[in-house]
């Protein structure tokens, strides 16, 4: 069988994942406002796809053209464009349907032609008080270089300034980074109506306020547009430049990086479309999409809570881990037994509080932590600064190459350094994606270490919407190896060995191959054999091939893959024993769990790494084997709930059909709700 039939192209698989997000917007069992927010998530995801995946494909086409072999990549490009256009049409239909449903619930998202005289007066005043100072027209003439100063993924209004037979053009940036995209209008009778207007439409309504007195014109017409740039870097390793300087210049480069997508309002005049395409240097390989009146739907992720309470998800208050309530401080609790937290069901407050305590505890000598993506107002960063002020030896490993968070991380690195924190940057080309901290504490004249190993970032915001595990432990078998990981980060080319941790790029591929091969041996011997994986992405061909081999040997394999999946299940003789499902629901499934049957004595790993080549071979990632039988069983219980979902689970198949898993005669199980109930029962205080 040819290779092209053994794997799904990762780009098409990624788009299929985003179609599952669109399914959530279409799902009438979801609350109305949550459905509108899923449209925002879909749009945000698609922006990232073009910045990264599509841009990467464009580069491959350029490379292949030089080698005379770009046909396959161009064919994939056409498939992508066709798939996106089809999904966008569905998106537009869903948006219009949701507007009608909103109106039935007395929520009205109006345009500039649907407002009353009182609202018109109010809007002009609002424009003068809040908006005008943020609006400066960009006049388009022969010398205008739009590529240089148009911002990535901002929405602009392209304005026709018409006087007789003459037409001039200008652009207005919609300042949604400074003013809320949704503006509540004064209500009209009946008072229960809740009218809102988009910032875009306020600008359309106030065009005269912007141009009058500066231009002579007979008419002004405005059309929306946006541009997406290539988000990858040209990271050349200049030994005389520090990584911080290199990243800063890379960020500047992104501001002038090549456009990869141009989206414009469908009724924009052809002459204007051509002018903008030429000014932006949009090639035939770039994605040019005629869209609706509004772009940057990602702002709809924050669609306001208006109307009745049943229009949004019912609250799920985050759970406290009752074990911490039994002790004076977090260290006593963790020293007594390992603690496993599962967000967003558990509160992230336990981790924040532990680091706060460490910042002033006289017994704490040193803290080491790595940050990849932290919250905008990070309490973790504050704790590290306070710890340094309190005389602790604080080391923070800052990943400057965390895509889309580089600017924030550069800022944090400078703030930490100014506070006396020892800041370390990763080596160029070796991202640190592990989620670790290590606290060294003097207890009875001995140093006791406390470690955190997680699947997600130290981020208060994402911990409310991403599912992730945190293992907190004082077990020396693990803490000593976490210490070795930090030593490896500081000296990345020095050999180091691990027994209880799987560490990329050191040993992950080797260990994973060995674990899969061991299951093959067990299956061939007629013993209990199986593999269960929960990951975000599965696209590494070496690991996919190993899973195919295991399936062919009779190993039962269950995969829960949220995003990209190159593996094709149910191919006769190749993947008959592999089942792949995906869950998209109110929380983003983000944790990575690997389970190997091991003849009944299951091995359970929590990991920061997806099964992608970059994560296995080119990043620092950490997976930990759970040693506590109770915690191991808890993770296995949660996995069983996920694999028994009958509401939000879809099959991943060769056709990328996203068919829902049929319920049949099984009971209704919505996994995320069931997991919350399961953990809530465990966390009830003892009577």
Swiss-Prot record:
Enzyme Commission code:
2.7.4.1
InterPro entries, alphabetically?
PLipase_D/transphosphatidylase, PP_kinase, PP_kinase_C_1, PP_kinase_middle, PP_kinase_middle_dom_sf, PPK_C_dom2, PPK_N_dom, PPK_N_dom_sf
- What processes in GO biological process is this protein linked to? polyphosphate biosynthetic process
> Which GO terms label this protein's molecular function in UniProt?
ATP binding; metal ion binding; polyphosphate kinase activity
One CC-aspect GO term: polyphosphate kinase complex
Catalytic activity from the UniProt record: [phosphate](n) + ATP = [phosphate](n+1) + ADP
Q: How would you describe the post-translational modification of this protein?
A: An intermediate of this reaction is the autophosphorylated ppk in which a phosphate is covalently linked to a histidine residue through a N-P bond.
Q: Which family does it belong to?
A: Belongs to the polyphosphate kinase 1 (PPK1) family.
Identify this protein by name. Polyphosphate kinase
Q: Which gene encodes it?
A: ppk
């Amino acid at each position: 069988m040819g290779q092209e039939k053994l794997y799904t192209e990762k780009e098409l698989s990624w788009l299929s994942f985003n179609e599952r997000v669109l399914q959530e917007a279409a799902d009438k069992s979801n609350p109305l406002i949550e459905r509108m927010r899923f449209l925002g998530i879909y749009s945000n995801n698609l922006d990232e796809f073009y910045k990264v995946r599509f841009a990467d494909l464009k580069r491959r086409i350029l490379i292949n053209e030089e080698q005379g072999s770009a046909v396959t990549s161009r064919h994939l490009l056409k498939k992508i464009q066709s798939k996106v256009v089809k999904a966008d049409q569905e998106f537009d239909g869903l948006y219009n349907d949701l507007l009608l449903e909103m109106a039935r619930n007395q929520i009205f998202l109006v345009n500039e032609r649907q407002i009353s005289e009182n609202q018109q007066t109010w809007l002009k005043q609002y424009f003068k008080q809040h908006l005008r100072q943020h609006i400066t027209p960009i006049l388009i003439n022969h010398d205008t270089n739009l590529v240089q100063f148009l911002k990535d993924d901002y929405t602009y209004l392209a304005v026709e300034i018409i006087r007789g037979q003459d037409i001039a053009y200008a652009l207005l940036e919609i300042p949604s980074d400074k003013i809320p995209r949704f503006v509540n209008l004064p209500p009209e009778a009946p008072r229960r109506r809740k009218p809102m207007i988009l910032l875009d439409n306020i600008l359309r309504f106030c065009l005269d306020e912007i141009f009058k007195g500066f231009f002579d014109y007979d008419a002004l017409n405005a059309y929306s547009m946006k541009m997406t740039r290539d988000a990858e870097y040209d990271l050349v390793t200049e030994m005389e430049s520090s990584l911080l300087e290199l990243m800063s210049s890379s960020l500047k480069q992104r501001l002038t990086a090549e456009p990869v997508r141009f989206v414009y309002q469908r009724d924009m005049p052809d002459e204007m479309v051509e002018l903008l395409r030429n000014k932006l240097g949009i090639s035939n390989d770039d994605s040019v999409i005629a869209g609706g009146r509004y772009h940057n739907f990602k702002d709809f992720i924050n669609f306001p809570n208006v109307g009745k309470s049943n229009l949004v998800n019912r609250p799920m208050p985050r759970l406290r881990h009752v074990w911490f309530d039994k002790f004076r401080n977090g260290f006593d609790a963790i020293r007594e037994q390992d603690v496993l937290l599962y967000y967003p069901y558990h509160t992230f407050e336990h981790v924040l509080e532990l680091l706060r305590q460490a910042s002033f505890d006289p017994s704490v000598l040193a803290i080491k932590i790595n940050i990849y993506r932290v919250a905008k107002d990070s309490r973790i960063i504050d704790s590290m600064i306070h710890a340094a002020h309190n005389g602790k030896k604080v080391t923070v490993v800052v990943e400057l190459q965390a895509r889309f968070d580089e600017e924030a991380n550069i800022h944090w690195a400078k703030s930490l350094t100014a506070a006396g924190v020892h800041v370390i940057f990763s080596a160029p080309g070796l991202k640190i994606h592990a989620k670790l901290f290590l606290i060294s504490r003097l207890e009875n004249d001995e140093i006791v270490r406390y470690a955190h190993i997680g699947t997600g970032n130290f981020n208060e915001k994402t911990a409310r919407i991403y599912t992730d595990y945190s293992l907190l432990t004082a077990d020396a078998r693990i803490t000593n190896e976490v210490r070795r990981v930090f030593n490896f980060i500081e000296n990345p080319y020095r050999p180091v060995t691990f027994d209880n941790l799987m560490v990329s790029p050191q040993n992950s591929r080797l260990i994973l191959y060995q674990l899969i091969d061991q299951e093959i041996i067990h299956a061939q011997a007629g013993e209990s054999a199986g593999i269960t994986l929960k990951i975000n992405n599965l696209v590494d061909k070496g690991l996919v091939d190993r899973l195919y081999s295991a399936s062919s040997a009779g190993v039962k394999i269950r995969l829960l893959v949220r995003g990209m999946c190159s593996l094709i299940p149910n191919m006769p003789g190749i993947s008959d024993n592999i089942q792949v499902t995906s869950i998209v629901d109110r929380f983003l499934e983000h944790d990575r769990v690997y389970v190997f049957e091991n003849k009944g004595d299951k091995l359970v790993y929590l990991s920061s790494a997806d099964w992608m080549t970059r994560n296995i071979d080119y990043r620092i990632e950490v997976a930990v084997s759970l040693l506590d039988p109770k915690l191991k069983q808890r993770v296995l219980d949660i996995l069983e709930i996920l694999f028994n979902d009958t509401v939000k689970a879809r099959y991943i198949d060769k056709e990328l059909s996203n068919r829902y898993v049929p319920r049949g005669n099984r009971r209704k199980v919505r996994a995320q709700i069931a997991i919350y109930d399961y953990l809530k029962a465990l966390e009830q205080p003892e009577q």
